[in-house]
């Protein structure tokens, strides 16, 4: 078994650097417990790179990412860079560029609501008796975000804008296969989202997914229109297992579901390619308003490194170890401010990182 791994660490902007520091605490414990050599090297990305090197995605950063087994990403963007557009902006010039360069076509976003946090959900707890345990499988490099042509034309009252939604059969097949295989390891149910009563891309999407489902007879498939799916997620989120989405629909629905779970600060994200190379990041943004105040929730970032171990390094036992420590911290009542109830004591970013690292370490020593 390979015991040597290289991880490119891109802390970025806002709360990215401080939550990254908490992940290092976890990695230090894991390295000692499992006797594996994990080499982490930090590189600049996003606004941080713009300030120091004049570009959101330096060539030196790309070079090291190409030499690594996976990328641990923080966050990019902030008010001082909002005037920058297109490839000069932190978001498009860095994050979208990484996705495109490494063909990270599959975005996996687990949405999990722990029993201890049910009261934080905007939904009545009677609507979620079985909690929420969903994985969004979102196609990430096709659809209307990337289709050409797009732009603006005309003048005055005749000015107009246009975007093009395009999906190829192979793009749908590869993302659907990931969804079905994940479902086989879970509750064996896939909900595929489209708008096949209107959009030609959705008609092809439904056709391809239905055909592939024949290869997975043990998995139940249902098709839902996007508008119906958005209602069902509010009405009965517990019914969902794997939600398979085109790019735009997945972007919208996963954020809706993130709020149902109580706090986006709890949610990790993985973007992977066909070779299991991936970029792992918290689902939330850079949150510049709370940066360096030691109040950001590092759990999403810590769970992201768990996903990195699971999907890119194929070390599922380590991923489970990290996830159990997070669950234990919550059961013991530890809360950052975003998941603390009114009048409930909260702990800092650094304290949460220390506690989760200690729980991993102590379990080994028992």
UniProtKB/Swiss-Prot annotation:
Record's keyword annotation contains Cell membrane: no
Record's cofactor remark:
Binds 1 Mg(2+) or Mn(2+) ion per subunit.
Q: Quote the record's binding site residues for Mg(2+).
A: 227, 251, 255
InterPro entries assigned to the protein according to its UniProt record, in alphabetical order: IsoCit/isopropylmalate_DH_CS, IsoPropMal-DH-like_dom, Isopropylmalate_DH
Q: What is its EC number?
A: 1.1.1.85
Q: Where in the cell is it found?
A: Cytoplasm
Say where the protein is mainly found: cytoplasm
Q: Which UniProt keywords apply?
A: Amino-acid biosynthesis, Branched-chain amino acid biosynthesis, Cytoplasm, Leucine biosynthesis, Magnesium, Manganese, Metal-binding, NAD, Oxidoreductase
Q: Look up the domain of life of the source.
A: Bacteria
Gene Ontology biological process terms, A to Z: L-leucine biosynthetic process
**What does this protein need as cofactor?**
Mg(2+); Mn(2+)
The pathway entry for this protein reads as: Amino-acid biosynthesis; L-leucine biosynthesis; L-leucine from 3-methyl-2-oxobutanoate: step 3/4
State where NAD(+) binds: 78-91, 285-297
Gene Ontology cellular component? Answer: cytosol
Reaction catalysed by this enzyme:
(2R,3S)-3-isopropylmalate + NAD(+) = 4-methyl-2-oxopentanoate + CO2 + NADH
One term of GO molecular function: magnesium ion binding
Q: Where is this site: Important for catalysis?
A: 145, 195
**Annotated substrate binding sites:** 99, 109, 138, 227
Under PANTHER family, the record lists: 3-ISOPROPYLMALATE DEHYDROGENASE
Per the entry, what this protein does is: Catalyzes the oxidation of 3-carboxy-2-hydroxy-4-methylpentanoate (3-isopropylmalate) to 3-carboxy-4-methyl-2-oxopentanoate. The product decarboxylates to 4-methyl-2 oxopentanoate.
Family under the similarity heading: Belongs to the isocitrate and isopropylmalate dehydrogenases family. LeuB type 1 subfamily.
Q: How does it assemble?
A: Homodimer.
Q: What is this protein called?
A: 3-isopropylmalate dehydrogenase
């Amino acid at each position: 078994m390979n015991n040597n791994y290289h991880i490119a660490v891109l802390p970025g902007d806002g709360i990215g650097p401080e939550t990254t520091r908490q992940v290092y605490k976890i990695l230090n414990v894991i390295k000692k417990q499992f006797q594996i050599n994990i080499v982490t090297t930090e590189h600049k990305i996003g606004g941080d790179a713009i300030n120091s090197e004049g570009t959101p995605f330096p060539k030196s950063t790309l070079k090291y990412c190409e030499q690594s087994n996976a990328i641990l990403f923080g966050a990019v963007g902030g008010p001082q860079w909002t005037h920058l557009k297109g490839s000069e902006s932190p978001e498009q010039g860095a994050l979208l560029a990484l996705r495109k360069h490494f063909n990270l076509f599959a975005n996996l976003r687990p949405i999990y609501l722990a029993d201890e946090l049910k009261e934080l959900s905007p939904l009545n707890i009677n609507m979620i008796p079985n909690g929420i345990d969903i994985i969004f499988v979102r196609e990430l490099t096709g659809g209307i975000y990337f289709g050409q042509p797009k732009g603006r034309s005309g003048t005055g009252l005749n000015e107009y804008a246009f975007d093009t939604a395009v999906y190829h059969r192979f793009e749908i097949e590869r993302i659907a296969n990931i969804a079905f295989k994940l479902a086989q390891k879970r509750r064996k149910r896939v909900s595929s989202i489209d708008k096949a009563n209107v959009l030609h891309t959705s008609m092809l999407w439904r056709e391809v997914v239905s055909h592939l489902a024949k290869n997975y007879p043990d998995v139940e498939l249902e098709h839902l229109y996007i508008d119906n799916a958005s209602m069902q997620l509010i009405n009965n989120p517990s019914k969902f297992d794997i939600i398979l989405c085109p790019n735009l629909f997945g972007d919208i629905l996963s954020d809706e579901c993130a709020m149902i779970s109580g706090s986006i600060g709890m949610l990790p994200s993985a973007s992977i390619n066909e070779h299991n190379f991936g970029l792992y990041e918290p689902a939330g943004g850079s949150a510049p308003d709370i940066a360096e105040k030691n109040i950001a929730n590092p759990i999403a970032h810590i769970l992201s490194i768990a996903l990195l171990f699971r999907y890119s390094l194929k070390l599922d036992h380590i991923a489970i170890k990290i996830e159990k420590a997070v669950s234990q911290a919550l059961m013991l009542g530890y809360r950052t401010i975003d998941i603390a109830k009114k009048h409930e004591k909260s702990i800092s970013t650094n304290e949460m990182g220390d506690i989760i690292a200690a729980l991993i370490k102590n379990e080994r020593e028992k």
